[in-house]
């Protein structure tokens, strides 16, 4: 590869999980943004869903409709890996110069992950361009990022694998803290934690509440999910780690949520559950469904 060749993260889910036609995609984004809830405080971070845009768009829009696009120079997205088994307790990162969207490119930031971490964190960063490029839990945010910021921000992406201990959570939080402090700084960086919530039904191998009346099952799932969302919003990372370690869950982004919760706790961010819903509200109701939540984090300090 020549030194001038750009490393481009190609959009693999356009025309599949969201419209690949720019004008239609703009109309779709406008619709979701018009349905978003107004949030008076300065947003610093968010936990958001990543399903196909017809499902996740409402949850994503609650954050993007309330972001000051002039306030940030950097966006970092942490997501789970759905397609590649990753080594645990490490941060799997990319080195792309640009991220493709139907609305135009988003500048990358390959230098963000490259410098060797300080002593004690060496070896915690693993190059994973291939896994990153095929991950919908990252790409589904690109249209909103491009629509909101244009080319004003630089985008960095990481996949979070299983985290085996609180020590591992804290170590990767140390690493992220160091990266951001050496980059744009906290006040100019917006963090997105990518996760859907409970996947319920035989197709997902998860039916702890049986196959009883659908409404009753949905209410029990919602109660469990809201407990998780509350612990994340309040920075109760040890409670979350205990919950995820001791009980079965199909929250696909539980490890990014753990890492984000620790990070936001350190920064003094406070979260609120802005929206909770499931796929049955957006299509034919079935016994199998996926739940989604948007949790918005704020601080009193302006970005």
Language-model segments: what does each one mean?
Residues 268-273:
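Acidic/polar loop patches that form or flank catalytic/metal-binding clefts of enzymes
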Residues 289-294:
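Short hydrophobic/aromatic beta-strand or adjacent loop that forms the aromatic wall/cage
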Residues 3-262, 266, 277-283, 296-303:
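Active-site histidine-anchored catalytic micro-motif
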């Amino acid at each position: 590869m020549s030194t001038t060749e750009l490393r481009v993260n190609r959009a693999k889910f356009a025309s599949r999980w969201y419209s690949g036609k720019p004008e239609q995609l703009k109309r779709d984004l406008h619709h979701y943004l018009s349905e978003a809830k107004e949030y008076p405080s300065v947003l610093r971070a968010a936990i958001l869903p990543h399903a196909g845009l017809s499902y996740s768009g409402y949850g994503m829009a609650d954050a993007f409709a309330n972001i000051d696009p002039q306030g940030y120079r950097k966006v970092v997205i942490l997501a789970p890996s759905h397609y590649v088994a990753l080594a645990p307790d490490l941060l799997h990162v990319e080195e792309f110069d640009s991220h493709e969207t139907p609305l135009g490119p988003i500048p990358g930031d390959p230098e963000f992950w490259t410098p060797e971490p300080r002593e004690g964190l060496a070896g915690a960063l693993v190059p994973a361009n291939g896994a990153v490029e095929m991950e919908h839990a990252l790409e589904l945010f690109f249209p909103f990022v491009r629509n909101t910021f244009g080319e004003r921000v630089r985008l960095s992406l990481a996949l979070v694998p299983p985290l085996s201990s609180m020590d591992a959570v804290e170590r990767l939080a140390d690493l992220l803290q160091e990266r951001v402090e050496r980059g744009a700084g906290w006040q100019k960086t917006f963090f997105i934690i990518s996760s859907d919530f409970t996947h319920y039904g035989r197709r997902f191998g998860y039916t702890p509440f049986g196959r009883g009346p659908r409404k009753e099952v949905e209410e029990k799932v919602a109660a469990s999910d809201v407990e998780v969302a509350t612990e994340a919003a309040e920075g109760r990372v040890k409670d979350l780690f205990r919950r995820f370690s001791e009980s079965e869950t199909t929250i696909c982004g539980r490890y990014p949520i753990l890492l984000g919760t620790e990070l936001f706790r350190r920064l003094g961010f406070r979260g609120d559950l802005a929206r909770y819903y499931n796929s049955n509200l957006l299509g034919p109701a079935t016994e199998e469904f996926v739940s989604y939540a948007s949790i918005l984090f704020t601080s009193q300090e302006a970005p």
